[in-house]
Regions:
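General helical structural elements
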Residues: 33-34, 58, 74, 82
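Short, charged helix-to-loop "capping" segments that act as catalytic/coupling loops
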Residues: 24-30, 54-64, 85-89
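Enriched for short, Lys/Arg-rich terminal
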Residues: 1-7, 18-22, 65-109
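Arg/Lys-rich, positively charged N-terminal/basic patches that mediate binding to nucleic acids
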Residues: 1-42
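A short, surface-exposed loop/turn module that caps and links secondary-structure elements
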Residues: 42-71
Length: 109
């Protein structure tokens, strides 16, 4: 029997955790976020890699990121995350979640 692939850890920044904890349990976004967490646990590269020249300076200075990814939810919301590696393990760190409008503001579109 083949070995089962190890799942990635999915964590959130302090800001994301505060945002997520404020979402009511019955809000459809909460369910959608849980679905995305599951997807990223299985494959941390499911999102779209954001080119370095588009990274907001805030992420570089605050989180010292080495990569940046975006995952667009069905609702149009986006999560921004970075992938950290430790030995053979990957950790997905969700930095922020945005509506489309707020995402465009953060990235200067």
């Amino acid at each position: 029997m083949p070995d089962k692939k190890k799942e990635n850890d999915v964590i959130g920044s302090i800001e994301f955790k505060k945002f997520f904890d404020r979402i009511p349990q019955n809000d459809p976004r909460k369910k959608e976020f849980y679905e995305i967490f599951k997807i990223l646990k299985e494959d941390c590269l499911q999102g779209d890699k954001i080119p370095h020249d588009r990274w907001p300076a805030l992420y570089i200075s605050k989180y010292r990121i080495k990569n940046l990814w975006r995952y667009t939810l069905r609702s149009g919301w986006r999560i921004i995350y970075t992938v950290l590696s430790q030995k053979d393990d990957f950790i997905v760190c969700i930095l922020e979640a945005f509506s489309h409008k707020d995402y465009e503001k953060r990235f200067g579109y």
